[in-house]
Amino acid sequence: MSETADTNQTAVVLFSGGQDSTTCLAWALARYHRVHTVAFDYGQRHRVELACRQRVREAIGQHFAGWGARLGEDHLLDLTSLGEISDTSLTRERAIEIRDSGLPDTFVPGRNLLFLTYAAALAWRLQARHLITGVCETDYSGYPDCRDDTIKALQVALNLGMDSHFVLHTPLMWRDKAQTWALAETLGGADLVELIAEHTHTCYLGDRTQRHDWGYGCGECPACRLRAQGWRRHRGLC
């Protein structure tokens, strides 16, 4: 929601290891003196992203010394029960299809609501006021838990429920994928763009056997198509 922050405060970034969350991590590292990260194992078929996120953290420490010094604790939380109750193509080995509702069956009901609730509970313990998530309402699949109204409502609920003053930041909310690539370049130059292309993971099928100019992936799933189209627009190739 907010695009400004106090550099003397602490943040928690919901960091999956994908393009969007890595860009958000860079955004937070440019603003806060201490930035913790959290991810969730919810039985996702593309759980290779959980290994990628460690390589991203290591690469940030190696190539961005100032940012590396600000990186705080990393947390991986077990939410496999979400995968057990979800009947989706992100948590089952099946083809990706569009439901009668118009939503793709990659939508995992409650996922971002739970992620942010757990992240807020962690932030409460760490005395971190700022929560950063990479949800957006532009180049996305229509997921209702990615919408700006949802995040604003959740911020109110979390603050009431924890008697706190959290600020939920969504740096990508009104940016498309081309603008997300551009933001990464603004934040960390060509080195960050290359880090994202090489080390992050977006593909819903978990494919890291095919390397494209925009990164690894099957090239056919909705996540790969959005990432590839954004890259081409950012590079002026379409």
Curated annotation (Swiss-Prot):
The lineage of its organism: Bacteria, Pseudomonadati, Pseudomonadota, Gammaproteobacteria, Chromatiales. Its cofactor is Zn(2+). Belongs to the QueC family. This is 7-cyano-7-deazaguanine synthase. Pfam families: QueC (PF06508). It comes from the Bacteria. Zn(2+) binds at C203, C218, C221, C224. InterPro entries: QueC, Rossmann-like_a/b/a_fold. The keyword Ligase applies. ATP binds at F15, S16, G17, G18, Q19, D20, S21, T22, T23, C24, L25. GO terms for biological process: queuosine biosynthetic process. Binds 1 zinc ion per subunit. Pathway: Purine metabolism; 7-cyano-7-deazaguanine biosynthesis. Catalyzes the ATP-dependent conversion of 7-carboxy-7-deazaguanine (CDG) to 7-cyano-7-deazaguanine (preQ(0)). Keywords: ATP-binding, Ligase, Metal-binding, Nucleotide-binding, Queuosine biosynthesis, Zinc. HAMAP family: QueC. One of its GO terms (molecular function) is zinc ion binding.
